Amino acid sequence: MTNKCFDVSIEENIAHIVLNRPDKRDSMIPEFWDELPAIIKDLDDHARARVIVLSATGPHFTSGLDTAVFGSTIENSDNPETLEKLNRQRSAKFYDTVKYMQQTFSCLENCRVPVLAAIQGGAIGGGVDLITACDMRYMTADGFLTIFEINIGMTADVGTFPRLARLIPEGVVKELAYTGRRMLAEEARALGLVNAVFPDHDAMMKAVMDIARQIAAKAPLAIYGSKHIINYARDHSTTDCLDYIGIWNASMLQAAEINEAMAAGRDKRQGDFVDLPTNRVKMGADVID
């Protein structure tokens, strides 16, 4: 798979996805929205990794949506009749586009393995949508985020508000949304939005990769269950979640994995765990397998 916006490597059961357009401040061009979900789907469907690290190159993690590129794709016509029909369709087409873009980030939340965001410089506009869909966030000392959409006269629509409002206090979200101000790394850490702040990119990547290795060493089935249940708990009552996790473990708990984890701890060695099964991508003769 050849990508225009990303480099992908897999080592030690860690998939490292790198935004690779530093000269353009890793802006989100149309290819970005196609490539990221395709990469995540491939990794998840084929169980190619136990954890994903998402990072970038250049001065910023991402400068967000490339509005110049998207503006040039608006359909138009010199024919008044055709233009009138296009205008009638425009709202429905815009809605469809927004839903497509939302799924680009929702795939990070929905994939079975944890996604760690390593953020240097700015996470601007759509960058906030991106990092809030990840499981954990880490940032360099010069890092910041900004809900930049308000500065160009629009409401953020690709995931910032439903996710950010669950991660930090609502009043802070509203201040960021209404003013477009920058939230610096230390403020983000103090509010729990980022897990840790590092002096520079190298120190951050070293630490994030170490955390990724720790995750990759655990039982993938248990990690999958933990991510699924934590996400479920965020959107449901305690009573619902307690019942759901009981049903989950009644059907998914594997004694062999527990025994292996205990033996590995006793013997002071890495556990020999099974990987996640591949996702079904089509129906066939092996429906039960």
What positions do the PLM features span?
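Conserved CoA-thioester-binding segment of acyl-CoA-metabolizing enzymes
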Residues: 1-57, 285-289
